[in-house]
Amino acid sequence: MFDTHTVEIEWAGRPLKLETGKIARQADGAVLATYGETVVLATVVSAKAPKPGQDFFPLTVNYQEKTYAAGKIPGGYFKREGRPSENETLVSRLIDRPIRPLFPEGYKNDTQVVVTVIQHDLENNPDILSMVATSAALTLSGVPFMGPVGGARVGYINGEYVLNPHLDEMDESSLDLVVAGTYDAVLMVESEAKELPEDVMLGAVMFGHKGFQPVLDAIIKLAEVAAKEPRDFQPEDYSALESEMLGLAEAELREAYKITQKADRYAAVDAVKAKVKAHFLPEEGEAKYTAEEVGAIFKHLQAKIVRWNILDTKSRIDGRDLETVRPIVSEVGLLPRTHGSALFTRGETQAIVVATLGTGEDEQYVDSLTGMYKERFLLHYNFPPYSVGETGRMGSPGRREIGHGKLAWRAIRPMLPSAEQFPYTLRVVSEITESNGSSSMATVCGTSLALMDAGVPLAKPVAGIAMGLILEGDRFAVLSDILGDEDHLGDMDFKVAGTADGITSLQMDIKIAGITEEIMKVALSQAQGGRTHILGEMAKAITESRGQLGEFAPRIEVMNIPVDKIREVIGSGGKVIREIVEKTGAKINIEDDGTVKIASSSGKEIEAARKWIHSIVAEPEIGQIYEGTVVKTADFGAFVNFFGARDGLVHISQLASERVAKTQDVVKEGDKVWVKLLGFDERGKVRLSMKVVDQATGQEIANEKKKEEAAE
């Protein structure tokens, strides 16, 4: 019934198995991939023909994690998986980026990749396995695809590169880098690092590229026995249209791209486009080409002319040379009632970034396959349509916004203080108010400024820069701080963020083969110069974190209590801690290890809560004098509440220096009194004395002390 084919190899010390022919047989391509004991199913379906009027390649990648893969049941009311999590969105992008450039130009059939994690061994991250399984499924499917693609994760532990480290090894690694590519080219890099130099980062890329070569061999081996017949796809030949259009519009387009102001440049390009449309799409008579074909070739021509201009003149669209960064203006304290704020403007790209400090209650609970954990640093990136002068949909963030926010998050996180050093939850929101390229890197810069303005003790300021690279034969140009118009026409787009001493995040997307290690080295070196320049411009606004928090930020004091006392502080059903919160006004968060965080904007409220908790967990000291309240009287003495919730007995003989006939003659319930802790009886009961303490001053009476010492 099943025509199954399997290939198995040893990869980085674990078995990798690729199997096809048994599951999801109606998909164009389906591969069940196993690494260690993590299992994913990747499927590919591509329509047999494009939709009429389709003018782009509609590729969709859906990565989904099923909770049953880790032996869990989903939370929530409905107890089933819902909308994609942030991690699922990020892995979907990770799979998409290296495969998208490998579909032939002109292929416009609806194509969907669905990757499902169906088993997780809690050791091997399914993201790399998903990339491999997707590549294998595409290679087998018969869909036109110039693969296969391999992928690998690279760690850097104790000065050594590690291929596909286990999940628990990542805690020791100063690098988390994912690289994907073909036999002879790197196509995609995504990474987070702890201030590593450029040569170490580039070395990791090449190490990963070499590391996934056996995977490519395995995919080819599987395809040799299981691949479907390739679909017959011949891209349309538009060389005649391009040649004619070039003759008609080249001179005017070159002039249009000499205009440095974005709006004026767009107007000039639109005028040329209108002329081209009028020529090739006349209102009267039958047009030789469709509007989609004319539009696509015009777009292609725009890219060619900009590339030629840059390579020929070493001058760019806005008049800059290759290495110059656009003018930068940095401001902090823009919104004085917020906890920290910054306005970062670089040319026509601008971000308002606001930092908010919260308590442990504000931490985000993340329910992942590997278990529940709490995230104390959140970074949200918003890209409204007005930022590019357009109208558009507003609502929940899209994949691009989530991806850009995570890139900035990775860049900043290595410089954040530890929870012990700075026990706040941090949320940063970046509002992109203008965009003409590199808005994610503007977010990195703005976040660094806003956090320093908020008084968050960042180890060092962080800056980011977006770079481009154009390669034609043996000529190439590296562009620093690319514009939006330059973003899509390059052969390599990469974003580098870091401090003056090293890289904290690197993202690369390489679209063609032929970009050598040497070219990447030049590009990273130029990016380092740009990053250093940007850090200098940021320093004009603020050079280091403020010494104190903003006026409106909450204060947090941390204290530690014995674990066995947690129950006493919380009380039955939370009664005690609720009373402390209600009466002091402070927020209180208690961890399982006995760490107590007390938060309030008022120092008095924090101190009141701290004293209250201390009185519950601390033990009274023998010989110390305490103020107390009489809570009950009896014939043999009075019970005094003197240390938090602790009561003790003042025996009738200890009420006063003279003989006392009746307890009520000396004290009544509710009286405030001073008592000295004499000790504990054989049953552990507290023994208190009033007669050795001056009830007016709370000071010990000297002669009574001598009598007491003599009696002892």
From Swiss-Prot:
Q: Name one GO cellular component term.
A: cytosol
GO MF terms listed in the record are: 3'-5'-RNA exonuclease activity; magnesium ion binding; polyribonucleotide nucleotidyltransferase activity; RNA binding
Q: What is its main location?
A: cytoplasm
Answer yes or no on keyword Cell cycle.
no
In this chain the KH domain maps to 554-613
Q: Which GO terms describe its biological process?
A: mRNA catabolic process; RNA processing
Report keywords, A-Z: Cytoplasm, Magnesium, Metal-binding, Nucleotidyltransferase, RNA-binding, Transferase
Is Cytoplasm found in the keyword set?
yes
- State where the protein is found: Cytoplasm
Residues annotated as domain S1 motif: 623-691
Protein purpose: Involved in mRNA degradation. Catalyzes the phosphorolysis of single-stranded polyribonucleotides processively in the 3'- to 5'-direction.
UniProt-recorded name of the protein = Polyribonucleotide nucleotidyltransferase
Native organism taxonomy: Bacteria, Pseudomonadati, Pseudomonadota, Alphaproteobacteria, Hyphomicrobiales
